């Protein structure tokens, strides 16, 4: 699934040639063509350090480490984004399923999907995000 047919215009317009130079092939395929990295292979799947997860394309802060949890699905999982403005959600009918795709609301980069099987004592949501779509910025817990 590519975002080429999507009508939404995002604030950050990215140059494809520059992205191909700057991103790894996996980062490019995940963020620009909605590919999915293999389960349990992502750099941030088991990261427990305090910090902020940012969009690999435009550096928009997306998730805090305090919202991360171990879901056992093989991808980094969060029960909420940093705030309600950073994520764009779109119904995804690919692969014979109906899911909700999660994209960066600044640049449109594909991040992953959101499911309603997250921690019930939090939001009940599980944002299942590809590590390849993220950069992690370590921060002390109290910041």
Swiss-Prot record:
List where the protein spans the membrane: none
| Entry annotation: catalytic residues | 128
| Co-factor binding details | Binds 1 zinc ion per subunit. The zinc ion is important for the structural integrity of the protein.
> Which one GO biological process term can you cite for this protein?
response to oxidative stress
MsrB domain mapped to chain residues:
16-139
| Catalytic reactions of this protein | L-methionyl-[protein] + [thioredoxin]-disulfide + H2O = L-methionyl-(R)-S-oxide-[protein] + [thioredoxin]-dithiol
Q: Which UniProt keywords apply?
A: Metal-binding, Oxidoreductase, Zinc
* NCBIfam families hit by this protein: peptide-methionine (R)-S-oxide reductase MsrB (TIGR00357)
Q: Which family does it belong to?
A: Belongs to the MsrB Met sulfoxide reductase family.
What is the official name of this protein in its record? Peptide methionine sulfoxide reductase MsrB
Biological source species: Burkholderia cenocepacia (strain HI2424)
Taxonomic lineage is:
Bacteria, Pseudomonadati, Pseudomonadota, Betaproteobacteria, Burkholderiales
